Each structure stands twice: as C-alpha cells, then as structure tokens.
Amino acid sequence: MQHRASERRSIQGWVPQVSILRPGIRSLPGIGCFVFAAVLQCGFVLSAQTAAQAWLKYRPIGKPLSVPTRVSTLGQSLLEQTAAIELRRGLLYLSGSTPLAAGPNTILLGTVQEMRARQPKTTLPTLEPDEFLISAKHGDLTREVDITGGSDRAILYGVFTLLRNLAQGIDLGEAVIRERPAMPIRWVDEWDNADGSIERGYAGRSIFFDDGHVREDLAPVAEYARLLASTGINGCNLNNVNNAAVFLTPQMLEGVARIAEAMRPYGVRVSLSVDIASPQKIGGIATFDPLDPAVKKWWANKVDEIYALIPDFSGFTVKADSEGQPGPASFGRTPADAANTLAAALAPHNGVVLYRAFVYNHHLDWRDPKADRARAAYDIFHPLDGKFASNVIIQTKEGPIDFQAREPVSPLFGGLTQTSQAMELQITQEYTGQQRHLVYLAPMWKQVLDFDMRVNGASTPVKQIVAGKSFHRDLGGIVGVSGIGQQAWLGSPLALANLYAFGRLAWDPNLTPEQIAEEWTRQTISTNPAVVRTVTRMLMQSWPAYESYTGPLGLQTLTDITGSHYGPNIESSENNGWGQWHRADHDGVGMDRTVATGTGFVGQYSPDVAKNYESASTTPDNLLLFFHHVPYTYKLHDGKTVIQYLYDSHYDGAPQAAQFVDDWKSLKGRIDSELYADMLPRLQYQAGHAIVWRDAVTQYFLKLSGIPDQQGRAGHYPNRLEAEDARLTAYRVIDVNPWEDASHGKAVYCGPAPDRSPQPAPDGSALPAPDRSALPAPDGSALPAADRSAQPSPNGSAQPAPVGSAQPAPVGSAQPAPVGSALPPPAQPTPDGSALPAPDGNAQPAADGSALPALDGSAQPAPVGSALQGSASSLKGTGFSPYKNSQEKKRALAPEGDQSCTADFAYKGKAGRFKIAVQYFDLQGGAAKFTLSLNGQQPNSDASWSADATLPTPHPHADNSTRHIIHNIALKSGDTIRISANPDATDPAALDYIEILPATP
C-alpha cells in the first residue's frame, strides 16, 4: 500500500490571505502575521485554503449573505483587530469574493463599554467577560449587525459564532444571539516533550518543540490557537506532565514566551506542566519539600520570572506521586501542601494550579482481592476537601481508571464540595483506536457531563459541578488532552470532530453530540443534507461499534496495557501491579467492587448512586463487569448470558466497522476528492482490524471458559487457510505472543524468528522479562500468559513497569502450553446455511507433489461479519527492534541477494468469483512486499502491495495484524494460490492466513 499524501506531509498552507481595507487603516494583517503591533503592515491577497483550516475552511454558500460585508471596529485592541480580520476573511470566502458592500450597511464590533459610548441611548445588558451579544437592526435603507462583547475576547467568540452559523447556511435574520461559556476553564493539555515527541500522540511531531527547544516556525501554533478560539477554548497547557523540569529553565521559558505571543491574538493563554521536584532538579536546592522555606522562595522567584516574560500566563498543571513522578509524599506531605505552595506563588499574578487527581500505586498486589486502583483518587483527595487554596483546581479524570472505552464516572466529582474541580478527558484516542479507528467520543463525554452524582440527595450533574455551580466555586472547567501534531492535527481527518466537540461541550455542555456532529460536518465536509446525514450517522455509531468489538460490559480496556494500549492483549491487564484487572478465570469474569464482598469502591458514591451499583441486578449491563465478578452463565437484563453476549457483541461490532466503509463509499463524488481518498483506506483498515479484535477476544474467552458460542462462530473459521499449514518455501512457523493475536496462535515469518530475550531500554536499564506463567484452561491444558515485557507506544514514549515490579505466578500454577496452540472447534455443529467453501483438512497435492491445504467446497456458513474489507493505513511511529543489534537484523533480514518466501495453498471448492483476504503482520522499520498469484499469474493490480504502514509493536502481534483484500477473483477446483513475500529491513513479511470470501460489488 502506498503512503497517503497526508501521511507524508506536514501541515502546510497554514493561513489563507485576503486583501482587507477599512477606514483609518490602510491594510490589516493576515492571521499568519501572528506578531501584532499597534500599526501592522503585512497586507496580502486572496489565496486558496487548505485542509489545515479544518472546520474554518470556509466555502462559498452559493447564495447572498444575510449580513453586511463591511466590518467596523470601535476599539483597537489586539483581540478586536483579530476579530475584524477573522470576520472579513470569513465573509469573503463565504460570499465567494463578493465585493465589500458600500454605504451604511455594517457589522459593528465592540465591547459593552465601547458600544455604550457610541450609542448612549441604547440599553445594553451587563455581560460577563466571555459573554457576547449578536443583534441585527434593520431600517428602510440600512442594516447593521452589532457584535457586543463583555471583553475583547468575547467579541472574537461572537465573530466565530456568526461565521459558524453562516457557514452552515443559517441566516441570522432578526435573531438575537446571546451566549456565555458554561465554565471558566476550557483548556487543552498537550503532552509534548522537549525533544519534539508527543506522549500518546498519534499525529507526528510537536508543533511547539524540537530537539530541546521551542521551534523557530510558530505559524502552526497561531493557526492552532485560531482553531481553539473558534470553539471557545481559552487555554493551552503546552508540555507533558512527565519529565517537565526542563521547561522551567530560562532558555526554555524564553521560547515559551514566543509561543504565548503566537497564541495571544486569539485569547488562548498558555500554561505549563511542572515537576514538583524542580527546585532540586534545576534549582540547586537539596530538597523539594513543599513546606521548606527555601523551596517556597524558589517557586515564588520562578513564577515572578515567568510573568516577567509572559504577563498573561495562566498557571501550572501538576502530576505528582504517580507512575514514577516525584511528589510531596516523599516528605510525608499531602497534595494540598504541594498545591498550596504553588498556588501561593501564582496568586499575586492571578495564576491557577491544576493538580491532577491521577495519583495511584502502580505496584498493587494483584493477589489481594481488596486492592483496587479505582479507589485511589477518592481515598487520597476526599479527606483533603476544603484544604486547598482558592486558586487550586483538582483535575479529575472522567473515570476512575484511565480513559477507557467505558468506565463509570469518577466518584471524586461528588466527593469534593469545598474544592474546585475540572474534568479531564482525552481527545487523543489512547485506548480508543489511536486515530486509526474512527471513534467519535462526544457521546461518551456527554454521558459523563450529564451523570447525576446525587450529592446529599440533590440533583448534582457533573456538568454543574465542574462549572462551579453546584458548590458555589469561582473556578472549574474541562481539560482535554489533545495530542495534536504536525500530521493533519490529529492524524486522521474525521478525528478532528473530537477536538471540535470538546470545545463545543466545554462552551455549552447542554449541546447534543448529534447536533455537534452535524455542525462539524457542515463546516468541514459539506452542507449537502445526504452527506450530513451519512457522516453524522457514522460518527454517532462509531463509539458503540468500537466498544462492541473491543471490551463491552465494562471490561475496561483489553488492549496491550503494558505496551502500546492499542491492539488486544487480554492477559496484559492481569497479574501485575497496574490495577486494570478484569479478574477473568475459568468460571467467571469481572471485578467485585461492592461494599458487601468486594473492594468497597461502590461506597465512594452517594447512597443514591451506590444502591444502583451495589447489586448486579440493578447495575447497568454496560458496566456490569466493572462492578461485579459474575459467572459466564450469569444472565443480563435481556436474558442473554455474559459469555454469549461477549461472543455476539464482537460478531455484531465488526460488521458495523465494515459498514463505515460502505457509508463512506456512498459519498464518492459528493465530497472533496482528496478527503475521500484519504479516509477510505483508514476505514478499510479499521474494518480489518475489527476482525482481529473479534477473533482475539472470542478465542480467548472460548478457551478460558470452555463454553462454546451458541452460533458456532468463535474459534471456527470455515473459509480460512492458515499460513502454517501451507506449503512453505523459506518461510518458518513461529508462535505468536499472545497466542490469541493470530488466527490459531501461529504465523509464518520470512527470516529467523526474533530473539525476545530482555533488551536494554533506551536509558540503559533493563526491561523486565516476559511473565510466562500460565492460567489453567478448562480442558486442563495451560493458557499462555501475557508477554509483559515493556514495549514503546507508537511515539516511543512508553513507560515500562519498574524492573522487578512484576508479580510471580502462584506456586503450583500450570506450566504454559506452546503459545499459539490451536483451538478446538466448538462442541456444537455449525448450522448448515450457505455454500461457501470450507476446509476439509485433507491435504491437496501441489505441482511438486507436496501437500497443500485445500478448500473442499462443502457447505458451511460464513461467519457473521466475516466478509469485511480492510487494508493497511496508519501513521509512522517508532519502536524497539526484535533483534539484538543492527548486525543481527542485517544478517537475519537482509542477506546478500533478494530474499523471498512463498506460501502455496490449493483451492478445491466450487467455481465462482470470490475475494481473497490476506491477513499479515505489518511490522515497523521496513516495507515488506507481498504478491498474490493464481496458478502463476497475478490476477489484478490489487494483488501486489507493500506493508508500508507503521503500527505499534516490533514483532507479530494484533497491534500490527492487517488485512488486504483482492477483489473479483475467479476460482475453480484445483487452482493454486501463492503468496510471495519479500521482507524489508525489520519487516519480515509475516503471514497469518488467507480467507476466501463471497465476492462483493
């Protein structure tokens, strides 16, 4: 597969330029001229817009505008000038460059004070600082639209609101629009590192930092601030909460001041994550005890230094005593002690501290049935309620674990009535597909915002708590971990719907996710009603689909939690100290968090909420396994057993992912051709990866429980030919780890199998060796446990578990069976249905007399949802090599001459037209080449492709298992299907299986 253009390029064409004239000023700058002065001299001409403008890529609406096109401002502030520029630019593009109107027709911009001074007889309401009023006045020959703001920033918000309506084809008419944000803190957090990498970022490198300093070119930063301001976001925390001390050095602060200057024209104020140990690490003080007078003085001096450079600096974000980050607990101090020391330094400058409640012990004893990571935030912070300074906000994750596809609302929201709180959510899709999967997160966030905590028996929805309204707090808000980078902001065009939705919900949490999706689609893609319906439907169905084919019923993530957090590795969350356990065994699954028999977590909620979660019978099915350990035969509210729901959910979810491909194809010719071509392979990849998820989870629970799927699908693949059963030339059979990540636990590998012995980490320390203890399977054999050796995330920023933290397997635990041992077929026969060819297990002779696996054409039904399409499509990343050093890699995969491997299969089914799915592993560090031939001939151009996507994990794994489809293949009994492969560097052209599927249009 070739790289898409959007993957190869950084964001370019940041700013369209328009010629603008207004009385009294000869020319006004384009927004790209982000360093503003009192009189600015960078005039410019109209130019084409690019995809970098996202939802601000204004297109002609095809009809006369309902507002004047002459703009006048009453003030000369930086933000008012920005507002005027934005409005002129938007009107020009929306009108298709219609000449500016002459005469008295005007859009007038001003603050309340400025408007009152101009129109002393006009009654204007008192507006809050970020509140605006849009009103229209009509006379016989005149028309005036006033945008009045409680501040100059509010004027800018009013301008973006007017343009949002016009871009959607909504006429202003005689309407009066008055809006104010629901909460004061509306920030994005960037987890950017000084070297330019981004923790949990999936869109390339940082737009802020590179090689230990602030980037020279900050035009992307100005354009990002423009996007943020257009949805009402008013703050940006620039750097990673881990390893943050360097950002307080004088050289770095001078660079941060340049970033602040770039964002200032849009009213976006910057803040920094700080390391609580900075006084010791960079200040030369022997301690970082927050109550030490020298430490307090150091922080006060450092804050003064910052404000001398950045007068509108917002404050600090703190991660402490968590996941290896230092904190006040080192000195017997509390989070309140640390937060208040910082708050005292910031208070004279009106700065704030956002102290993250993400504090927990990642060395929990998994054998202890009372141990529970979910309890940590409440246990630590609830006793400190009322002890924090007034300018401290506790930043609480939406759920008690860590940005899962579904988890309950954090009980801490109801546990702090005398302390300001902000909700932390994640725009970057760490556990929800990493922007390789379409997952629109607004419905999830909306459920959290609307959830009623029932504090003291009264209605207290989370949105009111974080807005400061429930408990009469002046501060509060929402913080979104953004992860934007140089590749199309979030890496995938449709992922930008999440950034847009975050801003809109932070401004108005009463908006519906569907309403926001429609707004975004009209502004970004098309106002065509059919397009809006289709894209909105895709967005709204994407989160339920993802949850369905990954981890339903409150299982939390089943991703590889000690590695990439991406593909399935179910055992990785068990038997270690990280506390994301689902407690699955032969008899049942789920974590008992009840007060009566479990960890007591349920008791952290108010009584009105706790009573619903304490009993399995009253717990919503979608959270059942988060709160309760139940037998696989436990019946849900619809009468279906837990195990059957797990099977059905995955077999229902995968076809939903495939439907996104068909939905998108229906838009061809109706939307921008570049956007169409960019998204199609991404959606095809998702459809294929949904099958990988489906198979891994259903195989795992089939073997663990011993209870077959009532429909005979799990572990039974009648249309597949396994690569390890093919006639192989140069390929070698390997075990895949974890075993459920391959169709039957094995794959073939073109080159020597990698040495997976522990390798040194980048810092020179040793990575923990895999824990290969085993769990007993129902048939008495052993299930292989997860390989818990630490692997980097796609951006290389993974934090391996500390050496020695792994818990040993219990004495007497079963010895592991070979990883990838084949699964037996289900006990029940599969019902007769279609006449698709199925394997009969009989070897067919190849041309040289050796045996080939065959399809005999016996009548077997295709697995529900098996006819899915997929192809590789993802973003570049980095990772550890499976080889000890570059010399071993060169010897193994790049011997002299071209290395090639082949796998031959025989077809002995009914004649007809089919499509062939090839499931292979696309490893980092190279681009292996594959060719499918039929009887020695390549059937079409799709039958040759490159494995040139970059996916996590450097050895064959569900993270990089990828599906390629060759359509419209005529097969007859006796045909030979050959897969020829050429490895490249560290990509060994690993192959899992081929699957013969019914042809589709």
Predicted segments, located by residue:
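Catalytic-core regions of glycoside hydrolase
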Residues: 116, 211-215, 250, 258, ...
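Acidic, contiguous N-terminal accessory segments
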Residues: 48-138, 173
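Feature activates predominantly on carbohydrate-active enzymes
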Residues: 76-86, 90, 124-317, 347, ...
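Extracytoplasmic
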Residues: 711-755, 857, 863-865, 870, ...
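Long, intrinsically disordered low-complexity tandem-repeat segments
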Residues: 755-871
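Catalytic domains of carbohydrate-active enzymes that cleave complex glycans
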Residues: 459-722, 728-731, 737-740, 901, ...
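Bacterial N-terminal signal peptides
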Residues: 31-43
